């Protein structure tokens, strides 16, 4: 059953044309209008229904001015005046969805299969899924820090939140002083967002608008658009197109948070991952499975498994070259730019070995008037619910250090709200070539919560000797019990002491990383923000870290390790008790650190 939207403070004027004379009647008292789908009803203070009708495609009705609506039924017309333009806008969007002819399709409907859209909005209508995203402290904390630190971009401004979900970003905008926030949400989560707005006494500043941003209207243009439209590999789910579509509501010189997105890709070697996929496909190689020969399907099984992008994290030592960056400037990009994304690459190989595929991650930047804040999903940063994505080649390519690996990654948008990926790679010196076709809609979620293993041959001294020579964290005195017999002990006291470094885990999984704090002025170094540019970057810097804690529904807060951010906003301090946007947030791009940027704790 559709949700009921309630609009208080409504006035009613009825106009009749009986016997050739114009007759008018106005309700002197304010009424309450309730709308469910196409059914509207007006009630007085005694809860008596004074008017009721159903709006369909054939109903004669129209907008009048900024906050009124007229319905004609037979010889009588009814004019409904709403208390505010925002109330009228919310009501009008409900009515539009009921009156839209079947032949009229929005931009979203044109690019999306109905079955995919139903599944998509059902998924995001669950509170548990919103919780998963909200508990990603890197994601949520970075958004809050970016908005609060750039409070001048929000104070007394009108903001549009695209795909607001629970409304958390809208609340951040209000915390930064926004005058009005229009929170648009197409899933049933809009009902929960509206309840949160009411329970937080913000109905005068936050207006929840149920519907797709491609199909709704706003009573005014906005100064700022905020959203969290990123999917795996940045582009999955195709919500970035809805984010760009929302620019039709943006004032000239308005801003968008996030402002730019960088996709990074680099070649990797991982024999274990490659063999895992082959091993799974080998199930179909059996000549007598319960008396049935399955081997005819083995080739199809290999193709299917290798079409799956791998979602997990990894040790950065599997990367064999510096990453290439592809930048999208959301302020300049058009929706059609994301229908076909071509990323050329040329890697100067730093190591010899087999290239099994390409690894992908992304960073987004919030470029505000006061500072630029980066949200990174790089393998050196705290793990997020985006993880990293790896795309295998069906046939590995052998390269030597100094070789050039060149080729193209092509992403073609499909109606499943995702992309078909084509990868072609070639070693220029030898002519060795490999390729693969992948389906980003059907990834394999491989992450287990354990520390990623380093590649074989990563130790250049004896790990066993290092284990016993770690700074006196363990002595035979503490390890001996009664009678001089060794007692049971935890090896973490040997290899995980406060002064030691665990060489088996180079990825900080739960612990906030060192804070990157640029000197004043608080802007990152100017960069080329042209859509569709790809550039080489330095290989990601690594900070050693002990392993933190992970849980399936989000990232458990880790210890700050004594590191503290010294540049928290004096206007809107963020409580670091929950590590939300505290030490975890880098104020400079983690993938492109300028020479005058200070790194604490590295």
Swiss-Prot record:
Q: Which GO terms describe its molecular function?
A: histone H3R17 methyltransferase activity; histone H3R2 methyltransferase activity; histone H3R26 methyltransferase activity; histone methyltransferase activity; protein-arginine N-methyltransferase activity; protein-arginine omega-N asymmetric methyltransferase activity; transcription cis-regulatory region binding; transcription coactivator activity
Please give the SUPFAM superfamilies that the UniProt record associates with this protein: S-adenosyl-L-methionine-dependent methyltransferases
| Pfam families to which the protein is assigned, alphabetical | CARM1 (PF11531), PrmA (PF06325), PRMT_C (PF22528)
Principal location listed in the UniProt entry: nucleus
Q: Which stretch is the leader sequence?
A: none
Q: What class of enzyme is it?
A: transferase
Classification via Gene3D superfamilies: Hnrnp arginine n-methyltransferase1, Pleckstrin-homology domain (PH domain)/Phosphotyrosine-binding domain (PTB), Vaccinia Virus protein VP39
Q: Where in the cell is it found?
A: Nucleus; Cytoplasm; Chromosome
Q: Work out whether the entry's keyword set contains Transcription regulation.
A: yes
Location of region: Transactivation domain: 470-602
Q: Does the keyword tRNA-binding apply?
A: no
SAM-dependent MTase PRMT-type domain ranges (all copies)? 117-424
InterPro entries for the chain: Arg_MeTrfase (IPR025799), Histone-Arg_MeTrfase_N (IPR020989), PH-like_dom_sf (IPR011993), PRMT_dom (IPR055135), SAM-dependent_MTases_sf (IPR029063)
Q: Which reaction does it catalyse?
A: L-arginyl-[protein] + 2 S-adenosyl-L-methionine = N(omega),N(omega)-dimethyl-L-arginyl-[protein] + 2 S-adenosyl-L-homocysteine + 2 H(+)
Q: What is its EC number?
A: 2.1.1.319
Please tell me where S-adenosyl-L-methionine binds in this chain: 130, 139, 163, 185, 214, 242
Which UniProt keywords are present, listed alphabetically? Chromatin regulator, Chromosome, Cytoplasm, Methyltransferase, Nucleus, S-adenosyl-L-methionine, Transcription, Transcription regulation, Transferase
Which GO BP terms, alphabetically? chromatin remodeling; methylation; regulation of DNA-templated transcription; regulation of intracellular estrogen receptor signaling pathway; replication fork reversal
| Function description | Methylates (mono- and asymmetric dimethylation) the guanidino nitrogens of arginyl residues in several proteins involved in DNA packaging, transcription regulation, pre-mRNA splicing, and mRNA stability. Recruited to promoters upon gene activation together with histone acetyltransferases from EP300/P300 and p160 families, methylates histone H3 at 'Arg-17' (H3R17me) and activates transcription via chromatin remodeling.
Q: Which family does it belong to?
A: Belongs to the class I-like SAM-binding methyltransferase superfamily. Protein arginine N-methyltransferase family.
Query: What is the protein name for this chain?
Result: Histone-arginine methyltransferase CARM1
What organism does the UniProt record list as the source? Xenopus laevis
GN (gene name): carm1
């Amino acid at each position: 059953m559709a949700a009921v939207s309630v609009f208080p403070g409504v006035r009613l004027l009825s106009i009749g044309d009986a016997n050739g004379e114009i007759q008018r009647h106005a309700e002197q008292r304010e009424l309450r209008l309730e709308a469910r789908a196409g059914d509207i009803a007006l009630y007085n203070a005694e809860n008596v229904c004074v008017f009721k009708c159903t709006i369909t495609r054939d109903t004669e009705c129209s907008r009048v001015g900024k906050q009124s609506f007229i319905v004609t039924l037979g010889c009588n017309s009814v004019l409904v005046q709403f208390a505010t333009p925002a109330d009228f806008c919310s009501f009008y969007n409900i009515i539009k969805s009921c009156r839209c002819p079947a032949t009229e399709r929005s931009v979203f409907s044109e690019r999306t299969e109905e079955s995919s859209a139903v599944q998509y909005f059902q998924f995001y209508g669950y509170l548990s899924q919103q919780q998963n995203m909200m508990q990603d402290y890197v994601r949520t904390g970075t958004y809050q820090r970016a908005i609060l630190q750039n409070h001048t971009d929000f104070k007394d401004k009108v903001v549009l939140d695209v795909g607001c979900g629970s409304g958390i970003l809208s609340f951040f905008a209000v915390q930064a002083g926004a005058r009005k926030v229009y929170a648009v949400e197409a899933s049933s989560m809009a009902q929960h967002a509206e309840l949160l707005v009411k329970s937080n006494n913000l109905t005068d500043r936050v207006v929840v608008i149920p519907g797709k941003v491609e199909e709704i209207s706003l009573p005014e243009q906005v100064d700022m658009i905020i959203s969290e439209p990123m999917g795996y590999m940045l582009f999955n789910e195709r919500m970035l197109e809805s984010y760009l579509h929302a620019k039709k509501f943006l004032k000239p010189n308005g801003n968008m948070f996030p402002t730019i997105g960088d996709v990074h890709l680099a070649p990797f070697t991982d024999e274990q991952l490659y063999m895992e996929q082959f091993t799974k496909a080998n199930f179909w190689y059996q000549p007598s499975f319960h008396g049935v020969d399955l081997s005819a399907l083995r080739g199809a099984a290999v193709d299917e498994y290798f079409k799956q992008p791998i979602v997990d994290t990894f040790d950065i030592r599997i990367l064999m070259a510096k990453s290439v960056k592809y930048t999208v400037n959301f302020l300049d990009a058009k929706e059609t730019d994301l229908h076909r994304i071509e990323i050329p690459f040329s890697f100067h190989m730093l190591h010899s070995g087999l290239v099994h595929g390409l690894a992908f991650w992304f960073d987004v930047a919030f470029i505000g008037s006061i500072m630029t804040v980066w949200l990174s999903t790089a393998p050196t940063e705290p793990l997020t619910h985006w993880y990293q994505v790896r795309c295998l080649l069906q046939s590995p390519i052998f390269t030597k250090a100094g070789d050039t690996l060149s080729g193209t990654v092509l992403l073609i948008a499909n109606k499943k709200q995702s992309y078909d990926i084509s990868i072609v790679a070639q070693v220029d010196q030898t002519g060795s070539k490999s390729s693969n076709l992948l389906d980003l809609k059907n990834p394999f979620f491989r992450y287990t919560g354990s520390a990623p293993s380093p590649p074989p041959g990563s130790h250049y001294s004896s790990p066993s000797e290092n284990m016993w020579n770690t700074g006196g964290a363990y002595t035979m005195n503490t390890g001996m019990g009664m009678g001089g017999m060794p007692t049971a002990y935890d090896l973490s006291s040997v290899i995980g002491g406060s002064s030691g470094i665990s060489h088996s885990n180079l990825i900080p999984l739960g612990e906030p990383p060192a804070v990157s704090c640029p000197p004043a002025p608080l802007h990152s170094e100017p960069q080329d923000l042209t859509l569709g540019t790809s550039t080489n970057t330095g290989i990601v810097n690594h900070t050693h870290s002990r392993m933190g804690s992970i849980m399936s529904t989000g990232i458990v807060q880790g210890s700050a390790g004594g590191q503290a951010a010294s540049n928290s906003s004096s206007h809107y301090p963020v409580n670091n008790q929950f590590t939300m946007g505290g030490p975890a947030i880098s104020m400079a791009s983690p993938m492109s650190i300028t020479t005058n940027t200070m790194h604490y704790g590295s």
